[in-house]
Amino acid sequence: MEYYHHSINKMAMFMVILVLAIDVTMVLGQGTRVGFYSSTCPRAESIVQSTVRAHFQSDPTVAPGILRMHFHDCFVLGCDGSILIEGSDAERTAIPNRNLKGFDVIEDAKTQIEAICPGVVSCADILALAARDSVVATRGLTWSVPTGRRDGRVSRAADAGDLPAFFDSVDIQKRKFLTKGLNTQDLVALTGAHTIGTAGCAVIRDRLFNFNSTGGPDPSIDATFLPQLRALCPQNGDASRRVGLDTGSVNNFDTSYFSNLRNGRGVLESDQKLWTDASTQVFVQRFLGIRGLLGLTFGVEFGRSMVKMSNIEVKTGTNGEIRKVCSAIN
């Protein structure tokens, strides 16, 4: 009996060590680590946090803007701040990036940090931290952000083709995510960022009036939701008008986005497909805690997936640079 308990204790200790090893691997990523600036610029993270909070208080739309910007940065050439670079043919000029916002928030934080820690903190890290702080500003859960990224020196609009599109099938979405080392759960979790933010009428109009050139709406749209969307985005109305991606909860980081998918009230075609495809529907159900399935806590899993995404093709050590100004290479 004593040997039995001893074996159980050893096994329990092994499992704890294994879990810790997994968490450490997740946090450290490819040369990044939590607290990278703790000795070289200890105020960096608090400056980013306060800057995001100040801008959010005057304009809540910066939160989804920054979160989307970080996603777009990581999916193109890795998380290296290349989305921040200005230029006639830079990433931010590509069609999927033309409505990004929050550049001023990142530059504001960078200016403050440079004043006390010149040449230390990368723009890529500021963006990663600001994305986390944007979720917190909208009442989402926090997570530890590994830092230590360096800034890239290449930014090309042509590379934006790696980004998932609003009309992509689930198979295409999964392929694009898998290419970046992200699995199906990561896909559903990260797309859950659409719980905050908006989309332009231009990207949903065909879905409302001429889906797949049928002359009618997407049949997956709930019958009571369709007239609401059509009222917001008339067939010949303002294509630039914005529509909330999470009806009724556009400014709160919560699971109502997934409830909307279950009820046929997803705004984007690619979002609603997460419910109609069995391989992704199961994760939507698990985030909703549907009985009979092993539940997943959305806020926790979102943070885990964000850490994975934030370590895509990062530049560390002597690769890249630390920009003096986020919008231009040194």
From Swiss-Prot:
Record-linked CDD domains: secretory_peroxidase
Residues with PTM Pyrrolidone carboxylic acid: Q30
Leading EC class: oxidoreductase
Disulfide links within the chain: C41-C117, C74-C79, C123-C326, C201-C233
Catalytic activity entry: 2 a phenolic donor + H2O2 = 2 a phenolic radical donor + 2 H2O
Family affiliation: Belongs to the peroxidase family. Classical plant (class III) peroxidase subfamily.
Protein name as it appears in the record: Peroxidase N1
